[in-house]
């Protein structure tokens, strides 16, 4: 075999290997897309709202099939699309996140995924009560604390301080008596989130008293979860932006349950929905 023929054979071999690698890459991408569309979602957790079960920068595999067959239960950790466009959280997403989110429903463009613990199902009445010996508050759902929520202390904030909280957050200019701290809070979240649009979709068709009211006898605010909606809170209550602030989450926004932490490797493992021994800040 002469040099020219040998060189030609090497080129042909390299060409075939390149084609095989390209085909393998295409098959891998197709497989990822199919799995993403029908079985799994992925997300990166940016905050410490679910510490210590899930910590900032954990990346999760989210299983999306279970909640197509049944309703999520009290105390389960659930991943859902925010009811609002979240401009600030969008800035924290990496190219991989944008690629995976590209296969999500168009109605959630600009939204991000949150992971929290489910506290209220449709029709549930929810209240926070001070219990003896605790610094925080325990949650009552229809008069009782669900077993999977019994070990968590919550801070009384947001809607639990004022039945008008959601409306004030959407229309702060209608409430001239707000404190400087409230004005700053509402101003920030109305610029970071498209909250007013989300409020209109969920609440404009109902009176505030249908979902939040002050119970004179109990001396605190009580909530009732509207039909086709859920109420979520983070375990690390003082560091969680959750339904206390932004309101109820429509059923259609639920993505699934976190199954596995796949990154970083030193956190690799399944996500345990059981209550952690400690929910304090690290």
Tell where the protein language model's regions lie, with residue ranges.
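Soluble "head" domains of membrane/secretory-pathway proteins
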Residues: 2-19, 55-282
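Intrinsically disordered, low-complexity boundary segments flanking structured domains
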Residues: 29-32, 48-49, 65-68
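Hydrophobic membrane-insertion alpha-helices, especially the h-region
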Residues: 23-40
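Alpha-helical transmembrane signal-anchor/signal-peptide segments
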Residues: 41-58
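Enrichment for repetitive, rod-forming helical segments
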Residues: 10-14, 30, 43
């Amino acid at each position: 075999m002469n040099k020219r023929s040998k060189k030609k054979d090497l080129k042909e071999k390299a060409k075939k290997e390149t084609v095989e690698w390209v085909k393998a890459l295409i098959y891998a991408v197709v497989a990822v897309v199919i799995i993403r569309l029908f079985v799994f979602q992925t997300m990166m957790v940016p905050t410490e709202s679910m510490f210590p079960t899930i910590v900032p920068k954990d990346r999760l595999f989210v299983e999306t099939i279970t909640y197509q067959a049944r309703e999520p239960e009290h105390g389960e950790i659930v991943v859902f699309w925010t009811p609002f466009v979240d401009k600030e959280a969008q800035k924290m997403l990496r190219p991989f996140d944008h690629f995976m989110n590209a296969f999500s429903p168009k109605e959630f463009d600009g939204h991000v995924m949150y992971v929290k613990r489910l506290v209220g199902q449709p029709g549930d009445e929810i209240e926070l009560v001070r219990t003896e010996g605790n610094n925080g508050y325990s949650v009552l759902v229809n008069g009782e604390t669900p077993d999977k929520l019994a070990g968590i202390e919550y801070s009384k904030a947001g809607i639990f301080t004022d039945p008008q909280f959601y409306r004030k957050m959407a229309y702060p200019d209608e409430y001239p008596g707000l404190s400087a701290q409230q004005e700053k809070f509402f101003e920030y979240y109305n610029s970071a989130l498209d909250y007013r649009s989300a409020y209109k979709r969920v609440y404009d068709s109902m009176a505030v008293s249908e979902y939040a009211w002050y119970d004179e006898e109990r001396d605190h605010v009580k909530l009732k979860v509207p039909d086709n909606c859920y109420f979520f809170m983070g375990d690390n209550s003082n560091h969680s932006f959750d339904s206390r602030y932004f309101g109820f989450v429509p059923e259609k926004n639920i993505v699934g349950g976190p199954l596995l932490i796949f990154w970083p490797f030193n956190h690799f493992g399944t996500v345990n929905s059981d209550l952690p021994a400690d929910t304090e800040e690290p």
